[in-house]
Amino acid sequence: MENQLQNKPIIELRSIKKSYGSNTIINDFNLTINNGEFVTILGPSGCGKTTVLRLLAGLEELDSGSIILDGEDITNVPAEKRHINTVFQSYALFPHMTIFENVAFGLRMQKVPNEEIKPRVLEALRMVQLEEMADRKPTQLSGGQQQRIAIARAVVNKPKVLLLDESLSALDYKLRKQMQQELKMLQRQLGITFIFVTHDQEEAITMSDRIVLLRKGKIAQDGSPREIYEDPANLFVARFIGEINVFEATVIERKSEQVVLANVEGRICDIYTDMPVEKDQKLQVLLRPEDIVIEELDENEHSKAIIGHIIDRTYKGMTLESTVEFDHNGMRVLVSEFFNEDDPHMDHSIGQRVGITWHEGWEVVLNDEDNQ
């Protein structure tokens, strides 16, 4: 029964359109979100992600299309009557009220009986581990504590969906990392559908069950963090999520259903793809920095790898990042290796001649024509 509830759609956006004047932000936009999911709507500035959130919250009106919440059409339902709450970037806490009164505010607006308010507020504060702060003012709390109070206020009236609008961006790095974990744990505890809007791909990967990546008002890819990172649908997705190296390739022949022999930046090698290809077709081979293998070479040593030289290196604690410039065309690639201080071949020096290969099958192969 629980799995059936989790697989049940809680939000459906059907063919929605929104314009501001002559500028169409989203058009014929469709999205289904299931009950209990933590979904992140991700994308660069101007992609339409905040517009989608505001439409869900009822803060903007649709030009056309419909919004369905738990089977009910709420397209024309005002914001205050939707079972959807929003945590904004600013948290919007009332500075003159105590924490208790901040959390109780929504219940009082809904005319909840006084005898119900105290236990519900304390329960919400207990969920975010701030019950002992009930009598303090927001200015007496840290940024992370204010974040949790804003969430407590948003969940106290038991919404079906919680929207979070870039609500971690004001925190410092360490606190932001901590809150990412706390938010995910809280979402699991509450069982409420969370829809998180951000431009930060690291946040999206860390917290989400599912990422919806937008580009110019369209869905560029919809999938799990792992699917989007390891199997990007196109070059935009690959470049937006993490670092990526893009190699030019030319098909020589298909060897099997999964394997193509190709010339990749001058290296004749197998690449793994089941897409239809023809001889001399141009492809792009995408490799994450951690997928690439560096082999140190003497200046006159022969190798079947792609040859280049180290032009920069950055120690990052657990990893060593090296920038390699290819000899044949000056292209630069980023390589990330787990740092091992006992390995004499790990700490590459500037100017070192190297050969570049990769773990077979870890590459992503895209059709050159599809990656504009």
From Swiss-Prot:
Superkingdom assignment: Bacteria
Binding site for ATP: G43, P44, S45, G46, C47, G48, K49, T50
Record flagged with keyword Zinc: no
Keywords: ATP-binding, Cell inner membrane, Cell membrane, Membrane, Nucleotide-binding, Translocase, Transport
Membrane topology: Peripheral membrane protein
Catalytic activity: ATP + H2O + polyamine-[polyamine-binding protein]Side 1 = ADP + phosphate + polyamineSide 2 + [polyamine-binding protein]Side 1
The keyword ATP-binding belongs to this UniProt entry's keyword annotation: yes
EC code: 7.6.2.11
Localization per Swiss-Prot or TrEMBL: Cell inner membrane
GO terms assigned for molecular function: ABC-type putrescine transporter activity; ATP binding; ATP hydrolysis activity
Domain ABC transporter: 11-241
Enzyme's top EC category: translocase
InterPro entries registered for this protein in UniProt: AAA+_ATPase, ABC_SmlMolc_Importer, ABC_transporter-like_ATP-bd, ABC_transporter-like_CS, Mo/tungstate-bd_C_term_dom, P-loop_NTPase, PotA-like, PotA_ATP-bd
GO CC annotations, alphabetized: ATP-binding cassette (ABC) transporter complex
Entry function: Part of the ABC transporter complex PotABCD involved in spermidine/putrescine import. Responsible for energy coupling to the transport system.
Subunit structure, as described in the record: The complex is composed of two ATP-binding proteins (PotA), two transmembrane proteins (PotB and PotC) and a solute-binding protein (PotD).
Membership in a protein family: Belongs to the ABC transporter superfamily. Spermidine/putrescine importer (TC 3.A.1.11.1) family.
UniProt protein name: Spermidine/putrescine import ATP-binding protein PotA
Organism: Haemophilus influenzae (strain ATCC 51907 / DSM 11121 / KW20 / Rd)
Gene for this chain: potA
